Amino acid sequence: VTSEVLAAPAVGTDGVVVKSGDNRVVLLDAADGTRKWIYQRATPSLSLRSAAPPVFADRFVFVGFPGGKLVALALQNGTPVWEGPVALPKGATELDRVADVVSVPVIDGRMICAVAFQGRVACFDMSQGGSLLWSRDISSAAGLALDNRYLFVTDDRGAVHALDRNSGSSMWKQDKLLNRRVSGP
């Protein structure tokens, strides 16, 4: 591993996936620690000092990156299979353009959802090459949770949102804990 690790590694039957602070993703053999492959993305000049842990699903490992991207890497060789825009960096300054996926993506069936700081919540269809199912403009660094009806997200101000998991429509919003550093659901 080339730099410090800012997120918990993911452990699966294919090995251990580690994401380092310099935006490198490495698959290590669980038995002896040898490197099976490495994937690297360019690092923006400014990003949050936090990282989303990688997540295994099927034949892929999913990793969120600064710049608002969720990337599906093939477990076999680390090749990017698809890339989904969770957020689109925008603004006049470097600080305005920070749009990082810093919470754990959630997976259920063919759906994977992620959220970005200064970005949005987005859900993708893994069986259709990462096609966007829906997105909502809700910024969060706290995280997501998914059940059989709703996707829950705590926004940057501390409001908790329940969104319809199939359409992204708002079902309810609880804002009684604003500005109290509410955790993810």
Specify the residue positions occupied by each region the protein language model found:
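Tandem repeat domain/solenoid detector
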Residues: 23-24, 34, 58, 79
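Structural signature of WD-repeat beta-propellers
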Residues: 13, 20-21, 65-66, 116-117, ...
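Short loop/turn segments that connect beta-strands within beta-propeller blades
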Residues: 29-33, 74-78, 125-129, 164-167
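Acidic (E/D-rich), amphipathic helical modules within compact regulatory domains
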Residues: 17, 131-135, 142-163
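Extracytoplasmic beta-rich repeat domains
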Residues: 1-12, 35-58, 83-107, 131-147, ...
